[in-house]
């Protein structure tokens, strides 16, 4: 292996959280991560979510759609503070000053063990994610097909109400019905006058109320010579908790599957927004993996007993969202069922020659890249998430509390700064909590726990944080160890399998012996994430694992924790990933703001693909590649450009944002 000089890439603010390949552990991580005897509900990255806990709203672990059926139409008690997609420009303006300051104190790749490259080509620079539309992710489904939004039509279904259902009620009538549905006032019924009294008109109003406001019954009444449709609760609050199962045709699958196209919004925020518009709980939605915010992403979603017609109607209401490719099926989707993701990435204003680009992309196609856990795994603030995870594993609960709540270098939202300052001054969880307008962030949840259980019971207080988010801290520590050990392995033995390396046979890890080393390639070699149910290589790297954990006051021979949730069995992960379906082209352009390829929505609207001149002011590299779950597109791009992908490094390189 040849180490080459690292070059740089300029990044727009906020663009480092590049999509990692989501869902549960992939085939090569066949040794599944076990926590308390079962896999955690997973999200973005494989063993767990890769979007690590931060000072944002933290949704709890999603229930399955089956679990949500009993209360599937109950509006969430805690609605989102925002009811729509905020404009990208507004977000950037709001955060512009704080971001560069915050990133001065962030992590670099060196801090988390990312130090090696596999290729020998000369690196070059480029601008990554100058626009979120320069990064497009298409989910690869269970059947191996890449998800595309290609059809906005609604399946023909005799049971579906007419389009008039969505327009027959006035805004005032909808408001009154919603208040009735949610028991927001003392009214026991709402009467809608039928202006044009025909049977067809009355039928449409009945259908509209029952379709748009599940849990309400309707009847027709004559009042002083006028016809009214009266809406009411048939069985009190139980009707709302147990919606009209009898209204769903038995011949139709219980789940409406659809393709969700979204721009600049992460999956959980998208689900929460859809839930709000549909007036249902988020737990009736299911999906195979979550997608990050700063990108255009296309993925399959399933929802319990919501018609395609209702979903399609949202296309008229929501910006930067499109729903389509509807079908009714018997089963929901499950986390981890996807086969991976296909990425389309534009690197703008590249400096590399055509020959450099060719060498870099051929190396990516033929050799691949080191399967490091990307920077987003470790958080973006001055307190890395792996440090919290290490403290949990050490049973250092006072340190866990301190790391999450103490003041930290770099800019944060003002209310968080005030909350941390109050905590440092008073150590009063109730007083610090009062500084937070949004109490669903990790800090708010921990402070609530401390208020409830007291300062002497930090373990229980920490337990208020949703389980997945707690586990992400310790998974971050495992990832930190794995990155460092893989760098040592490649530094010590290069890019060839050696005796003592580990490979998987089915789900079982075995050692490569001297006489069968030629039967394997570097693409077969795996390395363990530390845990109580893994084996370690039989060469120098085994001792390196032991030394690293010993330095962190952890016993590699006893990775069981006194709290079951934090006893990690470990897992295996391939050290080199070779992307599939790799293609690329270099294009010339003059305007940094023009899109360089069509999206699914562009194609639906019949827009012609961009035409490029043979020469232009700038050059861009357009890359396409597919990755299995639990791999990071950032690390593939890093290998091509020979760059440090950390936000801290890119902020130092690019302090003036290109607009």
From Swiss-Prot:
InterPro entries: PsdUridine_synth_cat_dom_sf (IPR020103), PsdUridine_synth_TruD (IPR001656), PsdUridine_synth_TruD_CS (IPR020119), PsdUridine_synth_TruD_insert (IPR011760), TruD_catalytic (IPR042214)
Location in the cell: Nucleus
GO biological process: mRNA processing; mRNA pseudouridine synthesis; negative regulation of translation; pseudouridine synthesis; regulation of hematopoietic stem cell differentiation; regulation of mesoderm development; RNA splicing; tRNA pseudouridine synthesis
Chain ranges of the TRUD domain: 368-578
Swiss-Prot/TrEMBL keywords: Acetylation, Isomerase, mRNA processing, mRNA splicing, Nucleus, Phosphoprotein, tRNA processing
CDD domains registered for this protein in UniProt: PseudoU_synth_ScPUS7
SUPFAM superfamilies: Pseudouridine synthase (SSF55120)
Region of interest (Disordered), ranges: 1-99
GO cellular component: nucleus
Enzyme Commission no: 5.4.99.-
Gene3D superfamilies the record matches: TruD, catalytic domain
A GO molecular-function descriptor: pseudouridine synthase activity
Composition bias, Acidic residues: 75-98
List of catalytic residues: 292
Family assignment from sequence similarity: Belongs to the pseudouridine synthase TruD family.
Oligomeric form and interacting partners: Interacts with SIRT1.
UniProt name for this protein: Pseudouridylate synthase 7 homolog
């Amino acid at each position: 292996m040849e180490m080459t000089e690292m070059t740089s890439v300029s990044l727009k603010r906020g663009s480092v959280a590049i999509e990692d390949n989501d869902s549960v552990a992939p085939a090569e991580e066949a040794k599944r991560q076990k926590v308390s005897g079962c896999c955690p509900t997973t999200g973005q990255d494989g063993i767990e979510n890769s979007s690590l806990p931060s000072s944002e709203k933290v949704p709890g672990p999603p229930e399955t759609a089956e679990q949500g059926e009993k209360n599937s139409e109950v509006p969430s008690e805690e609605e989102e503070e925002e009811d729509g997609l905020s404009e990208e420009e507004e977000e950037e303006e709001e955060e512009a000053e704080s971001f560069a300051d915050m990133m001065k104190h962030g992590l670099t790749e060196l801090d988390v063990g990312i130090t090696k490259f596999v290729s020998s080509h000369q690196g070059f620079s480029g601008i990554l994610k100058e626009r979120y539309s320069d990064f497009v992710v298409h989910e690869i489904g269970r059947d191996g097909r890449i998800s595309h939004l290609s059809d906005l039509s609604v399946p023909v279904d005799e049971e579906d109400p007419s389009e008039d259902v969505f327009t027959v009620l006035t805004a005032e009538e909808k408001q009154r019905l919603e208040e009735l549905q949610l028991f927001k006032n003392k009214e026991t019924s709402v009467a809608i006058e039928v202006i044009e009294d025909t049977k067809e008109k009355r039928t449409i109003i009945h259908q509209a109320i029952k379709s748009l406001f599940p849990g309400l019954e309707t009847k027709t009444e004559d009042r002083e010579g006028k016809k009214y449709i009266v809406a009411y609760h048939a069985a009190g609050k139980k009707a709302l908790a147990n919606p009209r199962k009898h209204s769903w045709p038995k011949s139709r699958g219980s789940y409406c599957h659809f393709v969700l196209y979204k721009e600049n919004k992460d999956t959980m925020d998208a689900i929460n927004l859809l839930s709000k518009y549909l007036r249902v709980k988020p737990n009736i939605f299911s999906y195979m993996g979550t997608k990050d915010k700063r990108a255009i992403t296309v993925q399959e979603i399933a929802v319990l007993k919501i018609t395609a017609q209702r979903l399609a109607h949202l296309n008229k209401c929501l910006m930067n969202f499109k729903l389509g490719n509807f079908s009714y099926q018997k089963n929901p989707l499950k986390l981890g069922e996807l086969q991976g993701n296909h990425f389309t990435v534009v690197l703008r204003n590249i400096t590399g020659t055509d020959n450099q680009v060719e060498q870099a992309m051929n190396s990516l196609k033929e050799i691949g890249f080191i399967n490091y856990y990307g920077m987003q795994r470790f958080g973006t603030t001055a307190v890395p998430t792996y440090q919290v995870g290490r403290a949990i594993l050490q049973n250092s609960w006072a340190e866990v509390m301190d790391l999450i709540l103490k003041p930290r270098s770099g800019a944060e939202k003002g209310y968080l700064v005030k909350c941390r300052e109050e905590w440092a001054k008073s150590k009063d969880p109730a007083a610090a909590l009062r500084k937070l307008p949004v109490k669903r962030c990790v800090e708010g949840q921990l402070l609530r726990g401390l208020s409830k259980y007291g300062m002497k019971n930090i373990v229980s207080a920490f337990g208020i944080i949703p389980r997945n988010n707690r586990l992400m801290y310790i998974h971050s520590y495992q990832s930190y160890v794995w990155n460092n050990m893989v760098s040592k392995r490649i530094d010590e033995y290069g890019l060839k399998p050696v005796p003592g390396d580990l490979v998987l046979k089915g789900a079982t890890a075995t050692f490569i012996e001297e006489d069968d080393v030629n039967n394997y390639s570097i693409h077969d070699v795996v390395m363990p994430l530390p845990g109580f149910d893994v084996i370690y290589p039989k060469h120098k790297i085994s001792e390196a694992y032991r030394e690293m954990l010993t330095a962190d006051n952890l016993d590699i021979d006893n990775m069981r924790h006194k709290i079951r949730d934090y006893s990690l069995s470990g897992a295996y992960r391939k050290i080199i990933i070779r992307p599939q379906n790799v293609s690329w082209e270099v294009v010339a352009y003059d305007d940094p703001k023009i899109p360089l390829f069509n999206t699914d929505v562009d194609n639906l609207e019949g827009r012609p693909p961009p035409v490029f001149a043979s020469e232009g002011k700038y050059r861009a590299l357009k890359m396409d590649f597919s990755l299995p779950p639990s791999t990071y597109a950032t690390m593939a791009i890093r290998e091509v450009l020979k760059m440090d992908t950390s936000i801290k490094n890119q902020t130092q390189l690019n302090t003036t944002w290109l607009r």
